[in-house]
Amino acid sequence: MQPTGNQIQQNQQQQQQLIMRVPKQEVSVSGAARRYVQQAPPNRPPRQNHQNGAIGGKKSSVTIQEVPNNAYLETLNKSGNNKVDDDKLPVFLIKLWNIVEDPNLQSIVHWDDSGASFHISDPYLFGRNVLPHFFKHNNMNSMVRQLNMYGFRKMTPLSQGGLTRTESDQDHLEFSHPCFVQGRPELLSQIKRKQSARTVEDKQVNEQTQQNLEVVMAEMRAMREKAKNMEDKMNKLTKENRDMWTQMGSMRQQHARQQQYFKKLLHFLVSVMQPGLSKRVAKRGVLEIDFCAANGTAGPNSKRARMNSEEGPYKDVCDLLESLQRETQEPFSRRFTNNEGPLISEVTDEFGNSPVGRGSAQDLFGDTFGAQSSRYSDGGATSSREQSPHPIISQPQSNSAGAHGANEQKPDDMYMGSGPLTHENIHRGISALKRDYQGASPASGGPSTSSSAPSGAGAGARMAQKRAAPYKNATRQMAQPQQDYSGGFVNNYSGFMPSDPSMIPYQPSHQYLQPHQKLMAIEDQHHPTTSTSSTNADPHQNLYSPTLGLSPSFDRQLSQELQEYFTGTDTSLESFRDLVSNHNWDDFGNNVPLDDDEEGSEDPLRQLALENAPETSNYDGAEDLLFDNEQQYPENGFDVPDPNYLPLADEEIFPHSPALRTPSPSDPNLV
């Protein structure tokens, strides 16, 4: 059946609509952009020719099919055996390649014979019929501008060149690009769109900024890391500093305690070793701990020899330190023999008394003291020293007991130490004797041997001021009538004397003219007939102090404490020996301040204090005013009516240290 004219006309209109159809860019499901490629025209009848599109008597038809990008690339790769990178191909170049390669548009646009350029034969038809199918506009000037942006150059034939404008621009256009070549679609990836100078500059600036930002970020990361490390180090240093200060505080406390220990030890050793403090009194070792056996044999733990002042302080201190170090290193079990402990006695003793003189005490004393000393014997039952932890004090007796007819029995072995000087030791007996205010003794029938001495000027008077202060209460009795003080009789003494120094009456001023009388002389008379004749004799030469004995338990405790103390300071004994040996001990004590120079301080020259003497608090406020005003002394409720009152010398009212002696068989006073 032959198609009618209407059918032919309808087919032509459909083909025309198909040719003039404007394709739309769609996005597939996978997100890939679709491009349009030229397809081969379908088979048509011979009479179905496109009349309007025919130029120069040639007619053709073009069908455009929308295909995915991958299919287009495969088509290009199969045709040219070359691979093209789809991601780098602009859409404009792909559409331009499809337009030039379309065989149906050869009458409008086609390749040059050389294949290096393409020609647009009819720009009017190209902008009217071709551009709307591939682009969204039909502006030929916009197409030319796009070609210039991608580097295409307009080619002008030499035959038509010249300064005058011709009509060839409207009739014919030719463009070329080194990478837009016929049959070489792989070169399309090398065609790049031109960028403006501002865009290039902005891009360079952005790149430089990005590089700088990366550098800054790297530096910031490094700085953060360094800051973290510094913070860790600071925390560590802070902790170490805190620990160091804590250790320093503990070391300071320990150092302060050690300084206190060594100051006490140095003060004690200096006071013991210094021979210039007193010409009559010396001090023996550190607490005179004598390990004596009851049988009298001298062992390795026997008591140390008494210090000799002629050997010098250097040798004494060195010997003392060596002995202390040796005793602390000695085993504790070897220190006590025969189940006995140390004998602790007063460290004050007189020069020249040898330990040999302490051997036989029964040559000097009677049976009573020998019986008391029997507790130190080796044999027999358990003594009282072993039963009681408290020290046992043996009461001494005067050596004048032989004058009253007492039997003198000498013990075989007896250690006599010098104890503290007290009124109980001086005035032995049940009660005190009587003595009038003038110093006369009823037993002797005459004045006592006490004498007065004029008060010294300068430092002597000032030193006597403190000494005389305990006896200022005696001035109350000056204006009162003479009276006696009751007291008991002591068999060891043949005279009367008060039991309290505060009860000594004030001596009138006319007695100060007697040079050989002393105000307070404690008489130890051997015979009543010779008591008044021996005025220059030492009143304390035949006195002695009790011996203090300790129980073994207390001895062990004391020895253990001493051992622990000296063991803790053993490492510093060598340095302490060097310190003591380098000191000039000859000048020590020369600049000792007087008592009244430092108010409230103890007298460094006062060796012993009487137990029954008035306390310092009773006369502390009045002793400074006692000798300043010669008229009246209204202080603490008493007055001195005598304006001629003068202070007594220091040795008259209270000696520096009463002469305490341990009797020896060779003493001529014991005969």
Curated annotation (Swiss-Prot):
Biased composition (Low complexity): 1-17, 38-52, 439-456
Phenotype seen when the gene is deleted: RNAi-mediated knockdown increases susceptibility to Gram-negative bacterium P.aeruginosa in wild-type and in a daf-2 mutant background. Abolishes both median and maximum lifespan extension caused by starvation. Fails to prevent paralysis due to proteotoxicity under starvation conditions. Prevents the heat shock-induced increase in lgg-1/Atg8 punctae in body-wall muscles, nerve ring neurons and proximal intestinal cells. Accelerates death upon exposure to the Gram-negative bacterium P.aeruginosa PA14.
One MF term in the entry's GO annotations: promoter-specific chromatin binding
Cellular component terms (Gene Ontology): chromatin; cytoplasm; nuclear body; nuclear stress granule; nucleus; WASH complex
One GO term (biological process): positive regulation of transcription by RNA polymerase II
Effect of R145A: Reduces formation of nuclear stress granules, in response to heat shock. May reduce sequence-specific DNA binding. Restores normal male gonadal linker cell death on either egl-20/Wnt or bar-1/beta-catenin mutant backgrounds
Compositionally skewed regions (Polar residues) per UniProt: 370-386, 474-493, 528-552
Coiled-coil boundaries: 206-240
Region of interest: Disordered: 1-61, 329-423, 437-493, 526-552, 612-671
Tissues where the protein occurs: Expressed in intestinal cells, body wall muscle cells, and hypodermal cells, as well as many neurons in the head and tail.
InterPro entries: HSF_DNA-bd, WH-like_DNA-bd_sf, WH_DNA-bd_sf
Gene3D superfamilies: Winged helix-like DNA-binding domain superfamily/Winged helix DNA-binding domain
Region: DNA-binding domain, residue numbers: 89-196
Keyword Protein biosynthesis annotated: no
Induction pattern: Induced by heat shock.
Oligomer status and interactors: Forms homodimers and homotrimers. Component of the DHIC (ddl-1-containing hsf-1 inhibitory complex), which contains at least ddl-1, ddl-2, hsb-1 and hsf-1. Within the complex, interacts with ddl-1. Formation of the DHIC may be dependent upon the Insulin/IGF-1-like signaling (IIS) mediated pathway.
Protein name from the UniProt record: Heat shock transcription factor hsf-1
Organism, scientific name: Caenorhabditis elegans
Gene it is expressed from: hsf-1
